[in-house]
Amino acid sequence: MKRIFILLNMLLQKNGWGRADYLRKNNILGHIGKNVSYRPYNLPQEAKLLHLGDNVWIAAGVRFVTHDMINHMLYFLGEKEFDPPILHVGEIHIGNNVVIGSDSIILYG
């Protein structure tokens, strides 16, 4: 329920600067620096694992993926030499002075 409330509030923000301010004021991300524009309307599943530096511009449609389940897929293909299904989770750190273009997918690691 809390996640839906956050996403609705992000939709109500006028622009990327407003969304970044909302994320910063409500301590939703792990870290968000100064002068950040966050244009996507979505958040990673584990938002606290996303860290944004100063002077960051994130275009619309960008997705941050903080987890993967490749072992899950391979295990059920009959390749039993892989470990049983495990959810792998990791942090994403975006440094200072970064621009991320539209519809990019950023993975952890």
Stretch-by-stretch model annotation:
Residues 1-29, 34, 62, 67-72:
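Terminal amphipathic alpha-helical/low-complexity segments used for targeting or macromolecular assembly
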